[in-house]
Design a protein with these regions (language model features):
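Catalytic donor-sugar/metal-binding loop of nucleotide-sugar-dependent glycosyltransferases
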Residues: 152, 177-178, 187-205
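Short hydrophobic beta-strand elements that form part
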Residues: 12-16, 64
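A conserved acidic beta->alpha catalytic loop
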Residues: 44-52, 97
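Donor nucleotide-sugar binding loop of glycosyltransferases
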Residues: 20-23, 47, 100
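Short beta-strand-to-loop acidic/aromatic patch adjacent to the donor-nucleotide binding site
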Residues: 87-98
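Cell-envelope/extracellular polymer assembly enzymes that use nucleotide-activated donors
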Residues: 10-12, 185
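Acceptor/aglycone-binding surface of glycosyltransferases and processive sugar-polymer synthases
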Residues: 65-84, 101-180, 206-224, 238-247
């Protein structure tokens, strides 16, 4: 996708948000400054604070979920919204400020030769590092998915990614909502559907608000869940998408 085709395609930024009143307005405003022509949908995933109100005031469209469904459930809403309205590209951006809007253009240009472009924290740009069980899980997932996708993937759990028309059609039909399903199982689905996946290096910023969920216990749980999510994803069979169209 060249710089001219970025503006010719209909792009929807989908931003899952749960109790992100401290950061969501700022992130929306930053995205709009970088890409003023794109549309932005904040999916309020059952927040009990002013996330929806502040996102709307900042200029985003807002879809409110009655209960918390997790990132997968929020993104499923976003993909169905995009498919119903004829968007060509969906870009997932976190509402906590960790994903730098200045990297969006590179993600979009990556769709020139791919159906899914993952923004990787571990591809040689920036100083982000994982440690402990979380690191081991990410390394193991990287090895498995690099073999499955036949390309090097260093950050398969990244939530910063761009997806083209074939990915939108696939994920609007079904998008996993289980923990880690939105990253691990969705990539297995994409590989089985013969979608092309690649990654680009990105810089990850500090959270603008809220509290990170890392601790030794949670990291150990993450390792176990990552392995289980991968096992379930490989066992399950999901509907494929017509792969006759170009990326």
């Amino acid at each position: 996708m060249s710089s001219t085709s970025v503006t010719s395609r209909r792009v929807l930024i989908v931003m899952p948000a749960l109790n992100e009143s401290a950061s969501v307005a700022s992130v929306v405003e930053q995205v709009k400054r970088v890409l003023p022509s794109v549309d932005l949908l904040v999916v309020d995933d059952g927040s009990v604070d002013d996330t929806a109100k502040l996102a709307h005031a900042a200029g985003a469209d807002v879809a409110r979920l009655a209960v918390n469904l997790g990132v997968g459930g929020a993104m499923r809403t976003g993909f169905r919204y995009a498919a119903a309205r004829g968007y060509d590209v969906v870009v997932q951006v976190d509402a906590d400020g960790q994903h730098d809007p200045d990297e969006l253009d590179a993600l979009l240009r990556g769709l020139d030769d791919a159906d899914i472009v993952i923004g990787s924290r571990f591809a040689g740009k920036g100083a982000y590092k994982a440690s402990g069980p979380r690191k081991y899980a990410m390394v193991a997932l990287s090895i498995v998915f690099s073999r499955l996708a036949k390309t090097r993937l260093t950050d398969v759990t990244s939530g910063f990614k761009a997806m083209g028309p074939r990915a939108i059609r696939l994920f609007a039909g079904y998008y996993p909502a289980e923990y880690l399903g939105d990253t691990v199982e969705s990539l297995v689905m994409a590989i089985r559907a013969k979608l092309t996946i690649k990654e680009i290096p990105v810089v990850m910023r500090e959270r603008a608000g809220g509290t990170p969920s890392h601790s030794p216990v949670k990291s150990a749980v993450y390792l176990s869940r990552a392995g289980l999510a991968l096992l379930l994803a490989l066992v399950r069979r999901r509907p494929a998408v017509d792969s006759s169209d170009s990326a």
